[in-house]
Amino acid sequence: MMEEYLGVFVDETKEYLQNLNDTLLELEKNPEDMELINEAFRALHTLKGMAGTMGFSSMAKLCHTLENILDKARNSEIKITSDLLDKIFAGVDMITRMVDKIVSEGSDDIGENIDVFSDTIKSFASSGKEKPSEIKNETETKGEEEHKGESTSNEEVVVLPEEVAHVLQEARNKGFKTFYIKVILKEGTQLKSARIYLVFHKLEELKCEVVRTIPSVEEIEEEKFENEVELFVISPVDLEKLSEALSSIADIERVIIKEVTAVTEESGAEKRTEKEEKTEKTEEKAERKKVISQTVRVDIEKLDNLMDLMGELVIARSRILETLKKYNIKELDESLSHLSRITLDLQNVVMKIRMVPISFVFNRFPRMVRDLAKKMNKEVNFIMRGEDTELDRTFVEEIGEPLLHLLRNAIDHGIEPKEERIAKGKPPIGTLILSARHEGNNVVIEVEDDGRGIDKEKIIRKAIEKGLIDESKAATLSDQEILNFLFVPGFSTKEKVSEVSGRGVGMDVVKNVVESLNGSISIESEKDKGTKVTIRLPLTLAIIQALLVKVNNLVYAIPIANIDTILSISKEDIQRVQDRDVIVIRGEVIPVYRLWEVLQIEHKEELEEMEAVIVRVGNRKYGIVVDDLLGQDDIVIKSLGKVFSEVKEFSGAAILGDGSIALIINVSGIV
């Protein structure tokens, strides 16, 4: 039966791990925030329960270890530090590897010793803990084999409900001592309520009075609690005797005892605030539950099948339109127009179903940036914007690695160490921005840093050294042409190779991935100001609007999303400047390429009048010269397969309404 729920378990576990990572990153910025500590604790507690239910004992055990560490932080026994979070993050990474192993092999055995890790982090937490400032003395009592009790004498003020505060204060006025006791049972303890009853029995023997328990006595009797119970006690005996008595009870992992020397009643305002907060949280939960209830999980394969069928419908519609043009059957015009509208609406709905927020990609990066910056001894303020920007799920699967490389480059090459930034008059903390937005029919993703920028002179020297250009050619290059050398395979300006970057691989791979998605990439950089890398992707790779053009009676398709403008030109409009053909549009010089020359196909004598399709690739423009324009159409992109994967000029093919094939021009691959 469990196999049926494995997919749901994996999906939900990944979501919890992502939320846990985000919470821990926030906790590092606000280590005293008890709400964040509680949130992380609850996430691990839920993960532990899910893993236990599915029978993944190693994962459940590891979650329990991390849960206990955060529980100590909740009880102010230890403080959250960056070093402690390093250990917790390492544990979260182990859980992630377990999930990957569960997906691939159905087992959570990752070949790593969980006990060793658990002992290490427990030891670190104990040795590195900082005692709260208000605690004066602390004594420990140990059983014969292991530590069970901790007793704390402190001047601690506890905020309690009015009735409890009144009782404890009255008891102190009469000379009694008042204590806060936390009993933690061992994991897997049977008959938990019976063990807590033994605690009550011991307290009764010592003539102690239990004023309040958390959870309630009824919940304890029904075992509606995990492994912890909190008590407020009035006692005639001192802390040491209490600790000695309670530590002797079997199956108790630990007892924490604090003497309460002052109590404070909740004010009316506090009560109202708490009530309001609870109401708000209840409303938030109800709203979240409402949203969840309106969503369903759909297998990706089913979405792909739906998209394929949608594509076939678009092709069928185009063929019907083509047939009607030949026979001019007016009676069918209205029906066909209605069919076209329905097809278009259906197409838009299917496209939206495939869209997912880019946060699915972005959310993995804050943790990576934090770890890498710390490893390289740099301080980085990482800002993400536009995480709710939606794009086709195909891009989500493909764009992650290129963005990862760009972020690593920014931290390694771009952002300077603290001392260097101060010497330059910059803020000591570097800024790294990852943003996404919709721009027309494109998704624009930018990676921007305020680091040292790219040394263009260094790029030119390296290009000359590699024999890519000579010195005379170098003098004529624009800034953009210089920066484009970074996309040449094996090109790197970094002298010293690090394990992060500088191995001469990466940017060419980034460019190849982006262009395989019919996208474009460009770089802007200013020395000592920073660098910005911009990626432009079409909204979808499935069905696109394209301009059909003709060259030598062959039909090609150019994606509308890449087209800036279209104009008719004559042979005389094309000028030769610095060994390249250009045209001038409203004072702007734009390079042009004859499509037949780019594709190396035979062409009849150049026509007096031709069409120039001006396309935009990143922040560059150029013109594609063709014989004629055939109009705009919705086309379904079909892959050319592995055999033609090296042909950069084409990004795919499409079946037209008359059954013929049109190759789709990859505007990034022409230049």
Swiss-Prot record:
It catalyses: ATP + protein L-histidine = ADP + protein N-phospho-L-histidine. It is an enzyme of class 2 (transferase). Residues 128-150, 268-286 have a biased composition (Basic and acidic residues). Pfam families: CheW, H-kinase_dim, HATPase_c, Hpt, P2. It is found in: Cytoplasm. Residues 291-541 form the Histidine kinase domain. Residues 543-671 form the CheW-like domain. GO terms for biological process: chemotaxis. Keywords: ATP-binding, Chemotaxis, Cytoplasm, Kinase, Nucleotide-binding, Phosphoprotein, Transferase, Two-component regulatory system. Its EC number is 2.7.13.3. Residues 125-155, 267-286 are annotated as: Disordered. GO terms for molecular function: ATP binding; phosphorelay sensor kinase activity; protein domain specific binding. GO terms for cellular component: cytoplasm. Residues 1-102 form the HPt domain. InterPro entries: Bact_Chemotaxis_CheA (IPR051315), CheA-like_dim (IPR004105), CheA-like_homodim_sf (IPR037006), CheA-like_P2_sf (IPR037052), CheA_P2-bd (IPR010808), CheW-like_dom_sf (IPR036061), CheW-lke_dom (IPR002545), CheY-binding_CheA (IPR035891). The modification Phosphohistidine is found at residue 45. Involved in the transmission of sensory signals from the chemoreceptors to the flagellar motors. CheA is autophosphorylated; it can transfer its phosphate group to either CheB or CheY. PANTHER family: CHEMOTAXIS PROTEIN CHEA, SENSOR HISTIDINE KINASE CHEA. This is Chemotaxis protein CheA. It comes from Thermotoga maritima (strain ATCC 43589 / DSM 3109 / JCM 10099 / NBRC 100826 / MSB8).
